[in-house]
């Protein structure tokens, strides 16, 4: 079991989104947000965080920390040597995210020479994580750095901790990026560079028109895995913090459907966002209202409707349908009971009769004479 913790750094205050600032617009990659610290505790911020990680480990839970791909405007002003610039000298900003500024991974892109100062910052980040006892890193928008960057950073982490894990936020092969100022996505390249796990495309499951589309995607991922070292996998990215609540796609039934799939699919580690287990719609009454109390230079309480609020001091996630969590628990119990078949068995799509619109998913998992049948 692994706990994925969203970025812990103090958000930037300038040109911010929300009254707390985005978790992905850090002021200091090597610092901890004072809002996360108990100021009545005599221990330092990192001592408190390490104690939290130690308690996770006592419970058999590993901890993965989310590493932002970009910087705040505050960091851009303080450390221009790390930052990417447009030809007119202005900061480079990824399309749709006006509160963050992109790093410059290259010293000379033509010669494929990395920016040594940015690389050193990220090595210090890795050192911080390992010193705290963190077990791995989720690399936000992994394609924002070239393969050469990861070719250095990932082996560096494993010189200190051979078991250190890496999850790449990378989705699907792109000939060209649809997003301005953002490189194209190449999941297979990320896995070759040393990432253990990727996001994949399950977040668009609700858009797939039929079971064949779903099955073909699984086959594509399995075929990709045959070209890579053993052990590469996807997370069950049916709903991450970047997506709207699965409750909007069909309520508790949809949540249970996707959890049953997550528990039985090949090459997949189940993944949930806090609040899923009780049916949180992530709807906030203060959405896009004005608030006189703010920690940033804006009074607007920016919210992406239906998504976990990462811009304001918010409530604890939670909904009103605990039966989702009960089904999740039973699905995980099934995955544990048949771990050998699910983790090592073959994936066999099954023929169906009478399903004219191809809406029924049916497959078997088979290993050493044992077969697990899945119908959804």
Task: Give, region by region, the residue ranges found by the protein language model.
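Hydrophobic faces of well-ordered beta-strands that scaffold small-molecule active sites
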Residues: 3-5, 63-65, 137, 166-168, ...
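Active-site-proximal helices and loops of the catalytic beta/alpha 8
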Residues: 53, 57, 61, 124-127, ...
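Active-site beta-loop-alpha junctions enriched in small/polar residues
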Residues: 8, 68-70, 142-144, 169-173, ...
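The substrate-binding groove and active-site-proximal loops of carbohydrate-active enzymes
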Residues: 25-46, 100-119, 134-144, 202-211, ...
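Conserved, mostly hydrophobic/aromatic
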Residues: 5, 29, 56, 129, ...
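Loop/helix patches that line or flank the sugar-binding groove of alpha-linked glycan CAZymes
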Residues: 237-240, 245-376
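Substrate-binding/active-site clefts of carbohydrate-active enzymes
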Residues: 7-132, 152-153, 158-161, 165, ...
């Amino acid at each position: 079991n692994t706990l994925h913790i969203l970025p812990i750094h103090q958000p930037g205050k300038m040109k911010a989104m929300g009254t707390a600032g985005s978790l992905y617009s850090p002021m200091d990659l090597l610092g901890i947000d004072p809002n996360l610290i108990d100021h009545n505790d005599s221990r330092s911020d990192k001592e408190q965080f390490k104690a939290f990680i130690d308690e996770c480990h006592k419970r058999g839970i590993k901890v993965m920390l989310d590493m932002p791909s970009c910087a705040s405007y505050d960091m851009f002003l303080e450390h221009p040597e790390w930052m990417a610039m447009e030809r007119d000298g202005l900061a480079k900003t990824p399309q749709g995210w006006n509160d963050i500024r992109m790093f410059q991974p290259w010293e000379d892109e033509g010669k494929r020479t990395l920016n040594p100062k940015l690389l050193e910052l990220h090595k210090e980040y890795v050192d911080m994580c390992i010193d705290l006892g963190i077990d791995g890193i989720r690399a936000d928008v992994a394609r924002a750095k070239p393969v050469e960057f990861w070719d250095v950073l990932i082996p560096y982490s494993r010189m200190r901790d051979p078991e250190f894990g890496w999850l790449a936020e990378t989705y699907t092969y792109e000939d060209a990026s649809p997003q301005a100022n953002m490189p194209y996505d190449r999941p297979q390249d990320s896995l070759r560079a040393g990432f253990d796990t990727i996001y994949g495309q399950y977040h668009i499951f609700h858009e797939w028109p039929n079971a064949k589309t779903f099955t073909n995607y699984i086959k594509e991922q399995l075929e990709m895995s045959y070209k890579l070292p053993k052990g590469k996998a996807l997370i069950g990215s049916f709903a991450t913090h970047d997506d709207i609540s699965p409750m909007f796609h069909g309520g508790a039934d949809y949540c249970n459907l996707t959890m049953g799939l997550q528990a039985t699919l090949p090459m997949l580690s189940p993944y949930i966002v806090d609040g899923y287990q009780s049916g949180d719609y992530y709807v906030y009454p203060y959405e896009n209202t004005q608030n006189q109390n703010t920690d940033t230079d804006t009074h607007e309480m920016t919210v992406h409707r239906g998504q976990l609020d990462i811009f304001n001091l918010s409530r604890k996630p939670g909904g009103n349908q605990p039966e989702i969590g009960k089904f999740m628990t039973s699905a995980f119990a099934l995955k544990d009971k048949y771990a050998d078949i699910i983790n090592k068995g073959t994936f066999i799509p099954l023929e169906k009769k009478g399903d004219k619109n191809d809406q029924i998913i049916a497959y078997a998992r088979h290993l050493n004479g044992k077969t697990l049948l899945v119908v959804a």
